[in-house]
Every structure is written in C-alpha cells, then in structure tokens.
Amino acid sequence: MAQAGSENKEPWNEETRAKFEGKSRSEYLDPCQEAAQRSIRCLHRNQGDRTMCSDYFEAYRECKKQWIERRREQKRKAGALF
C-alpha cells in the first residue's frame, strides 16, 4: 500500500487562518491542497488504481475534517452565527 508520508501538519493554524481571513472572497484557499496533490500524483503513478492510493485519500479526508472542525471552533469562539 502507498505511504501517505509522515507529515502531520495541522491544516488550520495561525498562518492558515491569517491567509484565509486576508484573502478576497473570490479567492480560493485550501490548506489541504498538498494532500490533494499527493492523492492525484499517486493515481497517476498507479494508472488510476484507487486501491493503491487509499492512504493518500484517507490523509486528505482527515486533513479536511480537521480543517472544517477548526474553522467551526474559530467561528464559535468569535461568536459568528454562520
């Protein structure tokens, strides 16, 4: 099975928060983009065989999950309704 790498960089940290809050509304920011790119590269290396890349997909899902949870937490702390 493919190795997803040993990096466990927090997707929602102060640096990411500052970038996210400082961007324009039309600009897209995904702190999990690196994990997404690894998944795509794995698919290319393995001729589209998703079973060979399951670790990469799981790392991406976990990154997104952490990011969304941290965003919700930040909004709750800030008292935002949405």
From Swiss-Prot:
Record's protein name: Cytochrome c oxidase-assembly factor cox-23, mitochondrial
Location(s) in or outside the cell: Mitochondrion intermembrane space
Organism: Neurospora crassa (strain ATCC 24698 / 74-OR23-1A / CBS 708.71 / DSM 1257 / FGSC 987)
Cellular-component GO terms for this entry: mitochondrial intermembrane space; mitochondrion
Disulphide-bridged cysteine pairs: C32-C63, C42-C53
CHCH domain segment(s): 29-71
Underlying gene: cox-23
BP-aspect Gene Ontology terms: mitochondrial respiratory chain complex assembly
Spans annotated as Disordered: 1-27
Family: Belongs to the COX23 family.
Residue positions of motif Cx9C motif 1: 32-42
Compositionally biased spans, kind Basic and acidic residues: 7-27
Source organism, top-level taxon: Eukaryota
Motif extent (Cx9C motif 2): 53-63
Keywords: Disulfide bond, Mitochondrion, Transit peptide
Chief location of this protein within or outside the cell: mitochondrion
Function text: Required for the assembly of cytochrome c oxidase.
InterPro entries in the cross-refs: COX23, Cys_alpha_HP_mot_SF
